[in-house]
């Protein structure tokens, strides 16, 4: 009897497993499919926005290539600091465009392949979305070129079952530049020059031409134009990836592209930012040049200079929050320019600090008393000699010991000294000596 019971229990267990497997094999009805993404015009627009979602978030330190150099330093254990430390390697990827941008390129090609099948979508919408997809494909390739040099050119939607032997390889640098430039030109012909407030941040013809011009200038630079260091940079089949022959024509091409972008932007009423108002609450910056340089990055009311905007909300780890001096409500001063970058700012006479006879470069680290009448720092207090008598860009963009800083939510002017943060007061605001403004 016991033996029969055991057989019965075993049989029921097996049947239960089979039932469970069949149940788990069922795809839930609410699971989104590719067809759902193009079910109607609204869904197609959401899919287009998902293509934009692959853009690196340039206001976050984790996605900004500006932090791969030696221009900044941080006291925190930030991942991007590994570039400056020399501890970046293939097993510790940071800002890895290779892992994400090819996904974005495929997403764009899927949109191009399916957009015409969307019910009730207009021809104008089809043309616009396709142009935006081409713009993003070009821009994603541009970012790959900036990060890796010669890259894989994805010119069409690749099949998922492509055998390894047919996988695309890297193409020569000049071929990459030419293909991306042509794609930017093609997209620009079908994109609007400006965007309404509701569509702010989406691709425009001005953005396409501007990015093309910047890319061509980069390609004309000595880094990629006739650099002999790349003589042995070749594909496995021996194909040269970077030409070692200098071409002056590349500079002319870059200049022509830049002029074309400027004329297009001017016709669309883009303009350089200029601050026309001066604060009456503060002793500085009364200089309009200095105010324009500072406010061009923070004036939300006048953004006529912005060509291609980052519209995603800045979070806790945004560049802005980590750059400005310590505030109790969420700013941490975790990014600062290096001394090398500080030295690159000119003097008040418009000369490099090592070429101005009135600037004693040997005394740049001396502690000095700020004289009466100074408008960019607190008279009577102390700071370093190198902070004195510098150009407007320096005082617009760099906060330093006992220099002034404007706060939007208060009419107090605070100076900075010491190293570690404290409550809102006129001291102890900069953790690492100086900060980006």
Task: Give the location of each predicted region.
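Membrane-proximal, proline-rich intrinsically disordered regions
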Residues: 21-66, 234, 386-388
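Conserved, well-structured interaction surfaces
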Residues: 39-58, 77-148, 162-200, 205, ...
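Short coil/turn linking the two alpha-helices of tandem helical-hairpin repeats
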Residues: 145-146, 150-152, 218-227
């Amino acid at each position: 009897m016991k033996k029969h019971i055991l057989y019965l229990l075993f049989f029921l267990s097996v049947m239960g497993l089979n039932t469970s497997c069949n149940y788990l094999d069922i795809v839930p009805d609410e699971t989104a499919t590719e067809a759902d993404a193009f079910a109607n015009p609204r869904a197609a627009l959401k899919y287009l926005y998902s293509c934009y979602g692959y853009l690196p978030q340039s206001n976050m330190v984790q996605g900004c290539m500006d932090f791969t150099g030696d221009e900044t330093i941080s006291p925190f254990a930030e991942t991007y600091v590994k570039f400056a430390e020399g501890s970046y390697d293939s097993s510790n990827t940071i800002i890895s465009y290779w892992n994400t941008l090819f996904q974005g390129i495929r997403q764009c090609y899927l949109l191009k392949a399916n957009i015409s099948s969307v019910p009730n979508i207009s021809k104008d919408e089809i043309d616009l979305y396709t142009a935006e997809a081409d713009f993003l494909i070009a821009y994603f390739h541009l970012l790959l070129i900036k990060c890796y040099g010669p890259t894989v050119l994805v010119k069409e939607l690749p099949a998922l079952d492509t055998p390894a032997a047919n996988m695309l390889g890297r193409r020569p640098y000049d071929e990459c530049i030419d293909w991306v430039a042509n794609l930017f030109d093609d997209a620009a012909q079908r994109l609007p020059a400006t965007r309404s407030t509701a569509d702010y941040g989406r691709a425009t013809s001005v953005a396409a031409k501007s990015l093309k011009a910047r890319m061509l200038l980069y390609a004309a630079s000595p880094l990629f134009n006739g650099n002999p260091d790349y003589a042995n940079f070749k594909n496995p089949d021996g194909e040269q990836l970077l030409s070692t022959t200098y071409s002056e024509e590349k500079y002319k091409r870059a200049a022509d592209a830049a002029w074309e972008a400027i004329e297009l932007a001017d016709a669309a009423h883009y303009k350089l930012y200029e601050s026309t108002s001066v604060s009456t609450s503060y002793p500085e910056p009364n200089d309009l040049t200095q105010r324009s340089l500072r406010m061009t990055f923070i004036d939300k009311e006048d953004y006529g200079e912005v060509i291609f905007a980052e519209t995603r909300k800045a979070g806790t780890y945004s560049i802005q929050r980590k750059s400005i001096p310590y505030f109790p409500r969420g700013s941490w001063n975790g990014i600062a320019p290096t001394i090398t970058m500080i030295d690159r700012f000119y003097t008040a006479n418009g000369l490099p600090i090592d070429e101005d006879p009135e600037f004693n470069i040997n005394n740049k680290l001396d502690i000095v008393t700020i004289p009466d009448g100074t408008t960019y720092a607190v008279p009577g207090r102390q700071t370093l000699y190198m902070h004195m008598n510098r150009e407007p860009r320096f005082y617009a963009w760099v906060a330093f010991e006992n220099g002034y800083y404007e706060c939007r939510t208060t009419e107090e002017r605070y100076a900075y000294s010491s190293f570690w943060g404290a409550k809102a007061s006129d001291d102890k605001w900069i953790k690492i000596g100086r900060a980006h403004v």
